[in-house]
Amino acid sequence: MSKIQIVFYSMYGHIHTMAEAVADGVRSVGGCSAELLQVPELISEEVLEKYGAKAARAAFAHIPTATVERLAEADAIIFGTPTRFGNMAAQMRNFLDQTGKLWLSGGLVGKVGSVFASTATQHGGQETTITSFHSTLLHHGMIIVGVPYTEQRLLTMDEISGGSPYGATTLAGGDGSRRPSENELAIARFQGAHVAKITARLTA
């Protein structure tokens, strides 16, 4: 059984919704399991409530918290993060910055790594967030997998949609009111399945 972790940070639920779709894609591939994990929050409960994020986060409060030690158990890790000024969220960066010991031991070398993201706007940094994230995965010796154009939904032109060859993305809107579209969720499911198929071959 190939073990695939989906490690994410979500403030308002957009990335959590995408993570569930990615997990569905993983589980559609025989011999592969999906485990959802969320990185620790850095923002106080008081501030989360002020920003209106506390209620949104309650919907996925049951998902276990990721630990650095747990990452080594996976055959592949698919990371999900919102964009913060063209980069990953601080919560994800903080978590990854604690993986020095794992890097030293080569614990992630040869494992598959993949990334999905969300932005507020159509050109809000979805691609730079993913490609800059790849630097960390390469330092860990991971094998990066994206979303090839065999996923025809990447070519959709009749609606505004996230998604790129670097990974699935969703557009949240400036006020966060837009939820992931079916096209975006389908690309996320494809990414999960694509990673699972490659991981299954590597671990056979």
Swiss-Prot record:
EC number: 1.6.5.2
MF (Gene Ontology): flavin adenine dinucleotide binding; FMN binding; NAD binding; NADH:ubiquinone reductase (non-electrogenic) activity; NADP binding; NADPH dehydrogenase (quinone) activity
Cofactor: FMN
Gene Ontology CC annotations of this record: membrane
Pfam families: FMN_red
Ranges of residues in domain Flavodoxin-like: 4-195
Keywords recorded for this protein, A-Z: Flavoprotein, FMN, NAD, NADP, Nucleotide-binding, Oxidoreductase
Residues that bind FMN: 10-15, 83-85, 118-124, 139
Superkingdom, taxonomy of origin: Bacteria
Enzyme class of the recorded protein, top EC level: oxidoreductase
Cofactor note: Binds 1 FMN per monomer.
Binding site for NAD(+): 12
Residues that coordinate or bind substrate: 103
Xref: PROSITE patterns: FLAVODOXIN_LIKE
Family classification: Belongs to the WrbA family.
Protein name as catalogued: NAD(P)H dehydrogenase (quinone)
